[in-house]
Amino acid sequence: MKKTKVNPEDDITLGKFTPKPSPQDSYQGNFFDVFRDADYKDYILFSGGLILSAVNGALVPFNSLIFEGIANALMEGESQYQNGTINMPWFSSEIKMFCLRYFYLGVALFLCSYFANSCLYTLCERRLHCIRKKYLKSVLRQDAKWFDETTIGGLTQKMSSGIEKIKDGIGDKVGVLVGGVATFISGVSIGFYMCWQLTLVMMITVPLQLGSMYLSAKHLNRATKNEMSAYSNAGGMANEVIAGIRTVMAFNAQPFEINRYAHQLNEARRMGIRKAIILAICTAFPLMLMFTCMAVAFWYGATLAAAGAVSSGAVFAVFWAVLIGTRRLGEAAPHLGAITGARLAIHDIFKVIDHEPEIKCTSSEGKIPEKIQGKLTFDGIEFTYPTRPELKILKGVSFEVNPGETVALVGHSGCGKSTSIGLLMRFYNQCAGMIKLDGIPIQEYNIRWLRSTIGIVQQEPIIFVATVAENIRMGDVLITDQDIEEACKMANAHEFICKLSDRYDTVIGAGAVQLSGGQKQRVAIARAIVRKPQILLLDEATSALDTESERMVQTALDKASEGRTTLCIAHRLSTIRNASKILVFDQGLIAERGTHDELISKDDGIYASMVKAQEIERAKEDTTLDDEEDEKTHRSFHRDSVTSDEERELQQSLARDSTRLRQSMISTTTQVPEWEIENAREEMIEEGAMEASLFDIFKYASPEMRNIIISLVFTLIRGFTWPAFSIVYGQLFKILSAGGDDVSIKALLNSLWFILLAFTGGISTLISGSLLGKAGETMSGRLRMDVFRNIMQQDASYFDDSRHNVGSLTSRLATDAPNVQAAIDQRLAEVLTGIVSLFCGVGVAFYYGWNMAPIGLATALLLVVVQSSVAQYLKFRGQRDMDSAIEASRLVTESISNWKTVQALTKQEYMYDAFTAASKSPHRRAIVRGLWQSLSFALAGSFVMWNFAIAYMFGLWLISNNWSTPYTVFQVIEALNMASMSVMLAASYFPEYVRARISAGIMFTMIRQKSVIDNRGLTGDTPTIKGNINMRGVYFAYPNRRRQLVLDGFNMSANFGQTVALVGPSGCGKSTTIQLIERYYDALCGSVKIDDSDIRDLSVKHLRDNIALVGQEPTLFNLTIRENITYGLENITQDQVEKAATLANIHTFVMGLPDGYDTSVGASGGRLSGGQKQRVAIARAIVRDPKILLLDEATSALDTESEKIVQEALDKARLGRTCVVIAHRLSTIQNADKIIVCRNGKAIEEGTHQTLLARRGLYYRLVEKQSS
C-alpha cells in the first residue's frame, strides 16, 4: 500500500471534523487580479494600449490648433476677397499647409486608435481566456457544501455575464476613459495656450457641464433600474402563469390572470414614463447649456478679438478645444461604472477561483492501497447539512457491510438514506462518528482513488453529449472497445445500442439522439461496470422507470452487484427483498434491521407497515406483497415523447446559458446587433410571421397618435437646430472677418441667436422626448397586454407547438415588446432629428455653395461604404465565430450542471482539458475580430480630419477659380459637418428599426392567432350539469401528431356519483381522456357527452365551472394560500375556504402558520412540501363544489406517509360527485365503482376490482407486475 500524508484540511481526531476558515471569505476583489500569472506580453499590451490611448486622446484637441490657423487664413482671405485684393499665393500656401496638417493628424489618430484598441482587445482576450480556464477548474474541484450554497445558473451566469463585465472593464472602456482624461487635459491646456482669458470663461461652465452629465447619468440609471425591476416582476408573473396554463384553463382563471398582469404592467408603465421624462430632461438640459455657453464664449471671444488680445481664429479654436475636452471627459466618465462593474465581477469570479474547499477532491494526498476487500463500517455517524444546521439528518447511525454483501436502505423521504451514500462518496464530511473502509477511516484514503473504486448508479443518470462509447469510457478512459461491449451486455444495453444509427458511435444526450429513461439507466450501469468497482451504490436506480424498463434495468443491476459490496436505496420494496440485510431508517436512526422475512414478520414494525401501505389486495389470496412505487411517467400531454417537460425546460435553460457563453467567448463588444437581428429574423420565420412595416406599427399606435403628432412637430423644430446653428456660426465668421469697431455689438446680437437656439432646441427636445417616450411606453404596455390576453385565450394545442414553449412566449413579452417600442419612443425623435438635420444641412450647403456641397457628401458616402464593408465582413464571420464556440460553451454548462457526476467519475481534469482544447479556436477568432473592430473604430475617429483636409483643399480649388468665396467654403463645410454629426447619431438606431419591424411582425401575428376552442365561453349552452359522462367511439390524435392515434374508438361512461378508474400502461390514453373531458382538445371522431349534451355544444367556461382537476404535480401560483384555494372564483367567503381546507386535511397546518391563509406559497408553491401543495390543490377543487372531479395520479409523486394523508382527503372529496381517477398505484383504486382497463387507445376491460381479477386479463397481469 502506498502511503502519503493524510489530507491536512481534515482533523479526524475523535471522528469529528473541523474545517479551517476559508481566507477567501474576506476577499474584496482587486482590479489587478486579472493580471495574475500574466506574462511580459500581457504587460506590454496593457501599457502599450494605455499609452497609445492617452496619446490618441491628447491629439484630438490639436484639431483646434489647426482650425485656428485655417480659420484665420479663411477670415483674412474673406476680408481680402471683399476688398478685391486677395493674395492667392499666400492664401493657397496657408490652406495647403493646414490641410496637410489635418491629413497628418488623421494618420496619427488612425494609427494610435488602431494600435491602442488592438492592444487592449488582444490583452482582454488573453486574460479572459486564462480566467475562463481557472474558473472552470476551480468550480469542478469544489465540494458539495459549496454547491449547496450557490446555484448552477449563477455559476454559468458568472462565466458569461461576469466575464462580459470584466471584458468591459479591462478592454476598450479603459482606453476610452484614459483617452477622455487625456483629451480634457490637452484641450484645456491648448485653450490656455491660445487665450487664457477666454479659456477661464469657458472653464466656469465646465463644472456645470460635467455636473449635468453626472446627475443625468445618476437619475437615469436609477429610473432604468426601477423600470427593469417592475418589468421583471411582470415577466416573472407571466412566466409562472404560462408555465401553468392548463391549470389556468381548468379553473377559468384567464380573466383573473389578465387583470393581474395588467396591474403589474401599469406599475412598469408608470416607471417607464418617468424614465422617458428623465431621459428627455437629460438630453435637453446639456443642449441648452451648450448653446448658452456658445453665446457667452463667442461674444466674449469676439470682444477680445476686436481688442487685439486674440486672433479671430482662436475664438473658434479655444471654444472647441475646451468643449471637446469637456465632452470627451463627460462621455468617458460613465465608463467608470464599467470599471466598477468589472471590479465587482472580478470579486465574484476570483472568489470562486480562490475558494479552497474543505474536501479537496483533486488532492493527490492520502493512502492508495493496492487491493481492498470492500468491508464498510458506519460507526456513530451524525450529520447535518451546512445549509440547514438546525435539522440533524443522521443521529448516530451504525452498521456494517461485509465484502460481497448487498445491504438495502429503506425509509421515508428525508430519513438519511441518500445522505449516507453522499458521506461514503465524501461529498460531505460527517459531523461525528467514523466511516471506515476495510477498517481505515475513509478520510485517510486518497479521495480520487476512493471515488474511483466506487461505482454509483442514481435515480436520474446523467448522460453527456457524446457518443455511446465516449459516455461509457467516462468510467475508465483506458478500456477497450471490447470492454465497452461486454459491459453493455452485462447492463442489458448492447441490444438497443446495436439498433442505433451508428451503434456505439451514435451521439446521444441533449440536442442529439434522445434515449428513454431505461436506456439511459442501462448506459449509466455500463459506465459504472467498466470501472470494475469493488463497491456499488444504487440510489433508487429504478424508481423513475416504468414497469417494463424497470424489469430490464433490475436484471442488469442484479448482474452488476454480483461479487461486489453493494448499498442499495429503494422506495420500491419489491426490488430489495433478496438483499442480505435491510436497514430501516427513521428520523435519522436505524429503527429496524434484518432480512425481508425477519422484518415482515414484525406486524407492528415500520418495514411491515410500509409493505402493507404498498400492497395490493388480491382475490383468492391474502398474501402480503411488496409493491413498487409507480412509474413517474412523462407528464406532458404527449405520452410517446421520450423527454420529460422538466428535462426539456432544463435543456432549454442550458441552451440559453450555452448561447450566452458562446457570445461571451467570441464577442469583443458588448452589443452585437447583427446577431440579434438574425436570430430575431429566424424566430419570425419559425412563427410563420412577416416583417411588419413602420406603417403597421404606427397604425397599431393610433391611440397614442395625438402625442406622436405633437412630438413630431417639436422633433422637426429640433431637427432645424443644428442647420440653424451652422448659419449663425457662419455669421460670426463674417462678423470677425469684416472687423471694425462694432464687432462686439454685432457679436452680442449674434449671440442672442445662440440663446434662441438654446431655448427652442431644449424645449423641443424635452417635449418631443417626453411625449414620444410616453407614447412608446403606453403602446409597448398595450402590445404586451394584447399578446398576453390572446395567449390566455388559446387552447392546449397552441402550447403543444414547440414554438410556443414557456421560454419562447415569455421572451416574446419581455424582448419583442421593447423592440417594437424602439420605433415609437425617443429613438424615433433621434432618427427624425438626424434625418431633418441632414436634409436641412444639405439644403443649407447647396444654398450657399452648390458646387462645394457634393464633395462633402462624397467623402461622407465613402466613409459609409468603408464602414459598411467592415461591418458586413464582421457579420459574415459572426456566425462562424459563434459556431466555433459551441463545443466549449457546451462543455462548460454540461460539466458545471452535472458537477456531482463529474466528481463521482473523477473526470474533473478530463472536462477541463476538453474545454481548454475546445476554447482555443474561439479565442484566436475573437482576437482577429477585435483587430477588425479596431480598424472600424480607427476609421471613424480619423475620418473627420481627412474629411476637413479634402473639403478645404477642394474649397481652395473653387476659390482659386473664382467659383466660390472663403466664407462660402467655411459655411458649407460647417453645415455639412453639423448634418453629418446628427445623422451619425441617428444611424446608430437604424438596426433597432430593423429589429422593431421583425418583432412587430411576430407580435401582430400572435395577436391575430385564433383559438380552435372558445376558451372565453362566449358561445355555447349553459344547462344545469348533473355529472353524467359518456364517451362513445372516440378517436383522437394530438394536433402536432395527426398520424398517431392516442384514442382509437374509446368508450367510457360514468353515472352521477360514481367513481370510475382508468388504468393501463403508459401511453394508452388515460390522461388524454381527462383532457377531452376538460375540453382542452376536441375529439376527431365520436362523441363526448356531459349528461345528454355534446361537450362541443356547451359553453367552455360553464363546463369547466362544473369540473375540478387534481393532477400528479399540482400547479400553485405565487399567491397566498387563500388566493390559491379560491383561484378563478369570485365572492368566496372565508367560511367556504376553511370548510374546503378542512376536508382536504390542510386547515390545521394553515392555521399553524404565522399569517394563516394570507401566507404566500412562493413561486410555484415552492414554500410548501409536495403533500401540502397537493392538499391545497384538493381544497381548490373542493371549494368549487364541482359536479365532476378528475384525479390524474394525484398521489403518485408522494412518499408513503404523504400519500396516506392526501388519499384520505381525496376519499372525502369525491363523495357525492362523479369522479374519474387515473392511477398506476392500483391499491388506490380497488374500491372504485368501475375500473376501465385501457390499451392502445381502447377500453379493453371493464368491471370492479374483484371482477377483473377473476378474468385474469390485462388488469390481472398489471397487478401481477406490481406485486412481483
Curated annotation (Swiss-Prot):
Q: Which UniProt keywords apply?
A: ATP-binding, Cell membrane, Glycoprotein, Membrane, Nucleotide-binding, Repeat, Translocase, Transmembrane, Transmembrane helix, Transport
Q: Which residues lie on this side of the membrane: Cytoplasmic?
A: 1-39, 122-170, 221-278, 337-708, 773-827, 870-931, 991-1268
* Residues noted as binding ATP 1 in the record, renumbered to the chain: 411-418
State the Gene Ontology terms under molecular function. Answer: ABC-type xenobiotic transporter activity; ATP binding; ATP hydrolysis activity; ATPase-coupled transmembrane transporter activity; efflux transmembrane transporter activity
The EC number of this protein is: 7.6.2.2
Q: Where is this region: Disordered?
A: 1-21, 618-648
Q: Which residues are glycosylated?
A: 83, 962
Q: Its topology with respect to the membrane?
A: Multi-pass membrane protein
Q: Which GO terms describe its biological process?
A: defense response to Gram-negative bacterium; innate immune response; response to metal ion; stress response to cadmium ion; transmembrane transport
Q: Which PANTHER family match?
A: ATP-DEPENDENT PERMEASE MDL1, MITOCHONDRIAL (PTHR43394), ATP-DEPENDENT TRANSLOCASE ABCB1-LIKE (PTHR43394:SF27)
Q: Give the similarity note.
A: Belongs to the ABC transporter superfamily. ABCB family. Multidrug resistance exporter (TC 3.A.1.201) subfamily.
Say what the protein does.
Mediates ATP-dependent export of organic anions and xenobiotics from the cytoplasm. Hydrolyzes ATP with low efficiency.
Q: What is this protein called?
A: Multidrug resistance protein pgp-3
- The species this protein belongs to is Caenorhabditis elegans
